[in-house]
Amino acid sequence: MKITNILSRPEPTISFEVFPPKQEAGLESVKAAAGAIAAMNPSFMSVTYGAGGSTSKLTVEVASDIKNLHNVPVMPHLTCVASSREHVRNMLSQIRANNIDNIMALRGDLPKDGVICNDYKHASDLIADIRSIDPDICIGGACYPEGHIECEHKSDDINFLKLKVDAGCDFLTTQMFFDNNIFYNFLYRIKDKGINVPVLPGIMPITTAKQLSRSVALSGTSVPERFRAIVDRFGDDPDSMRQAGIVYAAEQIIDLIANGINHIHVYSMNKPDVAKDILKMLNGIV
């Protein structure tokens, strides 16, 4: 099933993201976690892609398990910073061979060895190539309500986003944010630029202070005072911090749904217990 079909539904839905193991030795534990989340009947699941394509085989394997063993629609990620055109074609062939209808097209983070491929300069180039190879596949793209961490001017960031959509991107998923007003303002700004594809908000439940520090360092996401106070108060108490983080994420989701945003993507970090607790708090809403 295409994700655009899911996003056209009027009822609220929740989807989850998982990531593949860095080594094949961890594959079975990731499959087990993904299977546990799939059993919660999300609208779809996404599977990330290691820096420089380091986990491309495992990404497809986990995604195939979700789709073909658990019968949950799935969206594997594909990055282009270290990918050749031949590799992209091979990945698309593998994805289609596993009955998968969706792909998330990204530039991706630089690999640790610094080796890149110059076949694609931007995510928009990758999206255009995927669309030319497989006109029927559903393509997702990333967007950044506070601007990409590497982009100096927000206006430039939205111009790059317009290029993705014009290249054939069917819908967008946001980087995490902790203040819903930032997301609402972002929707107004992109609409003014003529970007009218569905935008799926990405919510990350923060369960430890360390997770917050790392996430902010990587993404540049701002932390509102209300959430900062929560981390300051509960950060040294693991159980309380976990619960407070889940409550905060659930409150974000409830506010989004109350304001007409019916489809939410949760960065569940391979943690079925977190996904389960989020859904428990949303019982009767989703």
Kindly give the residue locations of the regions a language model identified.
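N-terminal amphipathic alpha-helix/helix-capping segment at the start of soluble metabolic enzymes
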Residues: 1-16, 23-24, 129, 225-229, ...
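Active-site-adjacent beta->alpha loops and helix N-cap segments on the catalytic face
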Residues: 3-4, 25-27, 53-65, 84-91, ...
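Active-site mouth loops of central-metabolism enzymes
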Residues: 13-29, 74-86, 140-156, 233-247
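Conserved, mostly hydrophobic/aromatic
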Residues: 17, 45, 95, 164, ...
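Active-site beta-loop-alpha junctions enriched in small/polar residues
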Residues: 18-21, 48-52, 77-83, 108-110, ...
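Short, acidic/polar
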Residues: 24-37, 59, 85-93, 153-163, ...
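Catalytic domains of carbohydrate-active enzymes, especially glycoside hydrolases
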Residues: 33-48
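Active-site pocket-lining/capping segments in soluble small-molecule metabolic enzymes
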Residues: 118, 122-144, 194-246, 251, ...
